[in-house]
Amino acid sequence: MQALIKQIREHLDMSQTELAERLNVSFATVNRWENGRAVPNKLAQTKLYEICKENAVSVYDIILEKIANAADSILLSKGRVLLYHGSKSGIEGKIEPKSRSQCDFGKGFYMGTDPSQALTLICDYDKSKFYIVSVDTADLNLIEVPADIEWAMFVAYHRGRMEIIKGTSLYEKYRKMSENKDIVIGSIANDRMFYVIDNFFIGNITDAALVGCL
């Protein structure tokens, strides 16, 4: 937080004294924020955000720039990839598959290649944490699911939309699709895609229409 506040102040081209006056706090308060000895409360954060808006300073872009710089500083050995994860309350202990079972690819630990996606999921939570994760994929069992009809059915299975055909060969196909896999690689379904999948399973659209929406 302290580094972010300093970056914002520099983008605003203000001294600590000038920023303190705009926020109606003391110079010492801003100094403590930037030295990491204190954290601005909600009111101060809101005021700071409003000042940024008034001066066309994008806090979002500053955060993404900070993430990009941190990612660029990480040296990756062969077989390693950088991924991003957002947690609403932070990770304690070992990384474990603690998500809800009815997520797109089932219960797991979700990471992505786009930092903005992880940020979007946690931006409204006070205790949220953002992680850059280095993953060694060399000895892992992976499955990549392209954004096609197979992907839509795979997501539909994990979202519980296939329970009406439970026990059929089609159901079993997607139940076993990621069995014994360490990592599933694929796109995450947005709200529009959930709507399309739901309409397919209740018979409102054809399989051709479903494919056309992918």
Language-model regions: role of each:
Residues 86-93:
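Short polar catalytic/cofactor-binding loops
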Residues 149-214:
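Active-site-proximal loop/hinge segments that shape catalytic or ion-binding/gating pockets
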Residues 3-22:
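Short basic helix-loop element that most often maps to the first helix and adjoining turn
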Residues 1-4, 44:
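N-terminal positioning helix adjacent to the helix-turn-helix/winged-helix DNA-binding module
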Residues 1, 10-11, 49, 54, ...:
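Beta-strand-enriched accessory nucleic-acid recognition/scaffold domains that flank the catalytic cores
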Residues 24-40:
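Recognition helix of helix-turn-helix/homeodomain-like DNA-binding domains
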Residues 67-73, 78-80, 96-107, 113-175:
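ADP-ribosyltransferase catalytic core
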Residues 24, 41-61:
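DNA major-groove recognition helix of helix-turn-helix/homeodomain DNA-binding modules
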